[in-house]
Amino acid sequence: DAVGLTKGERIYIEAFRNSTQDFFRELIAVSSKIGATPFYYFNDESFTRSFLLNASEAAIKAHGEIHRRLMAESDAYVAVRGNDDVFALSDVPEKKMALYRKNYLQPVHSEVRVPQTRWCVMRYPNPAMAALSRMSLKEFEDFYFDACLVDYRKMEKELQPLKKLMDRTDKVRIVAPGTDISFSIKGIGSVICCGHRNIPDGEVYTAPVKNSVNGVVQFNTDTTYNGIFFSNIRLVFKDGKIIEASSLVNNDKLQKILDQDEGARYLGEFSFGMNPFITKPILDILFDEKIAGSFHMAIGNAYTTADNGNRSAIHWDLIQIQTPEKGGGEIYFDGRVVRRNGKLL
């Protein structure tokens, strides 16, 4: 249902890690029974690591060109990740990661997959994800299925008032411990995410007007990006641009990521996390950005569906949880409080 695949269409199916293989086979079987043509690609961050540590710039570029052609010929895309080793790329030099983002992630995914296909990205539960979440496997599986199998039709209806409010809002201000940031979302529009692009899902996103962002924001949720761990990221903006940035760990790598390209120092997304079954971080952005009572901002590339014009090889969602346990906070729309301590008013 997520990608609406029909007979005669082509689907690019990508699976990561051995723990996904049973589900991967089922996706291939189901798409074939429908009468679609699957291109199935088994991937693994350890494969990517081996490639990047040894590949030339020309080889990385050629790798991206091959997959861009395949993606351009596809009507739909599904990715399922096992996330057995979120740090698999941690020792790949940043220069190589920058080439990979520029020549593979941006042209294949940001420029083709996201705007041109019907796509869905999801996870598959396994012991490693449970361990990162500090849960038993059984507890994690229950959490996973609760979060993923929420009633998305009901969610879509319930999020309509927030979308309508965002669509008519100009000025946004966010105040929380370590945070006082303002920006405009006038004319950008907003999108409800309810089970079509991510599993689990549950957010309403827009984007700040590119040059309107001013102030400071502190993200109180740990995160990983391309296998690197970051904590307590703090960003200072002036006229849309990040002019200061820090992380408690791997601060030097944060600076290199922000220097990827011009767009990496501007925001491409602002979003409310709205999944009621996701209430604490598990070090997986796909889940953490949906935490009820949170918001996230993405540095880098904007989606064409809520477009502020920013383009970058980066799209990195950074999360602040505003529940009382995490310090609380307020979000103002045109001077009026619309959410306090994680609860919409």
Regions found by a protein language model. Give the residues of each.
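Active-site bordering "gate/hinge" segments
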Residues: D1-G215, N341
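Short, glycine-/Ser/Thr-/acidic-enriched flexible segments
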Residues: N18-S19, N83-D85, N126, I188, ...
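Short acidic-glycine loop/turn motifs at beta-strand connectors
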Residues: P177-G178, I185-G187, F237-D239, F333-R336
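Dual-mode signal for accessory low-complexity, basic/Gly-rich regions
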Residues: E244-G309
